[in-house]
Regions:
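Conserved N-terminal alpha-helix of the aminotransferase class I/II PLP-enzyme fold
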Residues: 1-23, 27
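Short, charged, surface-exposed secondary-structure boundary motifs
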Residues: 47-50, 68-69, 137-142
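Short acidic, S/G/P-rich loop/turn micro-motifs used as interaction or catalytic elements
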Residues: 24, 44-46, 78-85, 109-112, ...
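Catalytic phosphate/metal-binding cores of nucleic-acid and nucleotide-processing enzymes, i.e., regions
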Residues: 1, 11-14, 33, 66-72, ...
Length: 177
């Protein structure tokens, strides 16, 4: 976006169309279902629901107990509870770098936020996801994108490689931007 400085975004070269950000979340949770999920208090309710349903006794709030190897972090930015950069964003990412904890950044609202600078170059950030439904009135078209630093095969890749995706929504998204 114009006026935005997101250092490191160009490192995310593997792009997949997704049915909104939610499909990206689900694929991430499937990949990391054996890990302990870590969220900030006030995180988007979908992540809290997945913590309860999918991770059960493998979940802790960030800040209640230290991050550890074997954890996985999902964090919205802008943060779901405040609309700003999450508290301790850079220090959480630095700790995730140190411990090799994979991070998914939910950036669904970045296009309408006042956040102009972010450091996305942290190696722990494996996936960034966003959608067009916050900027344009297309919430029922499920126009999302998953951006990954490294290629990893999964069903979303298979859908995209074989063009087994909602082409109407993809074309609408291209037209909107």
């Amino acid at each position: 976006s114009k006026g935005k400085n997101f250092k490191g975004y160009q490192e995310f070269k593997h792009l997949d169309f997704s049915n909104g950000t939610t499909e990206t979340f689900d694929k991430f949770y499937q990949t990391h279902h054996g890990h302990r999920l870590r969220l900030l208090k006030g995180e988007y309710f979908y992540h809290q629901l997945q913590a309860k349903l999918m991770f059960k006794n493998r979940f802790d709030w960030i800040g209640d107990v230290p991050l550890a190897e074997g954890d996985v972090v999902v964090m919205s930015c802008p943060f779901s509870d405040t609309g700003g950069v999450p508290v301790d964003f850079d220090s959480i990412l630095a700790e995730c770098d140190r411990l090799s904890v994979p991070v998914l950044l939910d950036m669904a609202y970045i296009s309408i936020s006042s956040i102009n600078e972010l450091d996305l170059s942290h190696p722990c950030i494996k996936i960034i996801t966003s959608s067009l439904s916050k900027v344009f009135p297309v919430e029922h078209h499920r126009i999302g994108i998953r951006m990954r630093r490294e290629f990893e095969d999964d069903t979303l890749v298979a859908y995209n490689q074989t063009k087994y995706i909602n082409r109407y929504s993809v074309n609408l998204g291209h037209h909107m931007i």
